UniProtKB/Swiss-Prot annotation:
Its EC number is 2.7.4.25. GO terms for molecular function: ATP binding; CMP kinase activity; dCMP kinase activity. Belongs to the cytidylate kinase family. Type 1 subfamily. It catalyses: CMP + ATP = CDP + ADP; dCMP + ATP = dCDP + ADP. It comes from Aeromonas hydrophila subsp. hydrophila (strain ATCC 7966 / DSM 30187 / BCRC 13018 / CCUG 14551 / JCM 1027 / KCTC 2358 / NCIMB 9240 / NCTC 8049). It comes from the Bacteria. Pfam families: Cytidylate_kin. The keyword Cytoplasm applies. GO terms for biological process: nucleobase-containing small molecule interconversion; pyrimidine nucleotide metabolic process. It is an enzyme of class 2 (transferase). ATP binds at residues 12-20. This is Cytidylate kinase.
Amino acid sequence: MPQMAPVMTIDGPSGAGKGTLCQLLAEKLGWHLLDSGAIYRVLALAALHHDVELDAEAALVPLAANLDVQFQVDAEQVKVVLEGEDVSRTIRTEEVGNAASKIAAFPRVREALLRRQRAFRQAPGLIADGRDMGTVVFPEAEVKIFLDASAEERAARRYKQLQDKGFDVNFERLLTEIRERDDRDRNRAVAPLKPAEDALVVDSTAMSIDEVLVTVLAYAEQQLGDVSTN
């Protein structure tokens, strides 16, 4: 039986810096990228476009099963493509983000997207960005990272990110939404947000992205041996 491509899972709460880290890792290693959170955001956007109620699990399941999503990594950004359309900017609004968190709590919706996510595991390797990548989707992954940061720091990062993209946002409201989302994600019955038992926990509150990248690459070398880099 051929050896499966290695997987590095990067889990953690919203705003911890997972997206930036995963993009840098995918570029550095030349590996494929799976943005699990984006898949849920794409599904949420599809639901909003098709007027599917966010609490209608039975209607969301077939929508999830037939979701056509791709991630195109280049030197500057990761493009999220839904049925041929670049929805990278649209899915990053707070409305879509909150909708994604709600639909992710449905067990049958998560199951419908599970197989699609696992299909991203292809040579030479996969960087899997999410909240339950190391605990549920790829429990056998060779490298597991749990990237964390304080709620205040994550709100500040998100505030700056949205402002830079031209969105009008309120910091206090953003902080409240992050805390509420944390509570939902950490306490949901299915796949709650928590580090895998064999994950390296990295608190990025006082770290630069470069420091986080060096830490993660060093750990990957320990777990995998010599990883080829671009």
